[in-house]
Amino acid sequence: MEKLTYQFLKDTGAKVPIVGGPMYPGSNPELVAAVSNSGGFGVVQPLALTALYGHDFREGLQLIKKLTKNPFGVNFTIFGGANKKYHKQMERWMKISIEEGVKFFLTSLGKPNEIVKVAKQHQIKVYHDVPNKKVALAMKDCGVDGLNCINWRGGGQTGIQSAEKFIEELHDIGIPLICAGGISNKEDYKKALEMGYAGVQMGTRFLATHECKVTQSYKQAIIESSEEDIVWTNKIAGNNSSVIKTKDVMQGGLRTGPVINFMLRQSKLKRYARMYLMSQGLKNYNKTAFDDSVQFWQAGKGVGNIKSCLLYTSPSPRD
């Protein structure tokens, strides 16, 4: 076992180096627990847990703890403090996570300085989503323990470069790198580890499981789609997000209008535009998760290797 893979397993408490990516929708307690029970490492998304699945945050964490005796993590989307109400809520969620014994935070979309500072006081590991080398180096300077390298094959908020490019640029960074994007079977998993990644993050593969509480039509769309069916839109969070090409998606358009486009190009306005888009997206996600007639489905380019809906009881990718 490579040194940094061992470090990742030590950081998470997982038995195999597979992260169940935090998803909205898809971050229901049953799925998070199933990933951890199988030897991987489930990560819960607080907004999905509360706003989508209707759990009080503390009670949701306690439910996951009842469903698995193995460790799991919590994801915090930062947004750079654009929304003070949300920022206060995130601080409350972090406090509750600490009280409930969570020992791993996965952060994204913003600078995690404050979270890292608090986490280190409680011996909590922090990994951060990164899209490129520049951000990766900045996050290491912030003191994060590992990097979740979001490549261009990922579902949801996707990256801008290949998994190979990340390794080429960051192979000597000295902290664990997780390959996030396009991992859907054991061949993808093995290839990522052979490239030099400490582990992988899987999202789309876990949506098409019996434990995931999204509609059957969503799961079936993943099973029936190919890599060519995945398109990018910036209407979810301001940056590119991968979705399955459907009539609903194309009718709504893939790109934001001129006002939001302008805001996204301004450093002082960008975070507010992203926050607005995310708030609008949350309304659509609620329909996506529970209404079979709504065809707005996030998924990555690994869909082509997903051929069935699984009961996730194996500690490594199948199919």
Residue spans for each PLM region:
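Short glycine/proline-rich, acidic loop/turn segments that cap or connect secondary-structure elements
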Residues: 276-300
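Active-site entrance/lid segments in N-terminal catalytic domains of soluble metabolic enzymes
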Residues: 1-176
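Conserved, mostly hydrophobic/aromatic
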Residues: 35, 192, 203
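Glycine-rich beta-strand-to-loop/alpha-helix junction loops that act as flexible
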Residues: 178-183, 202, 311
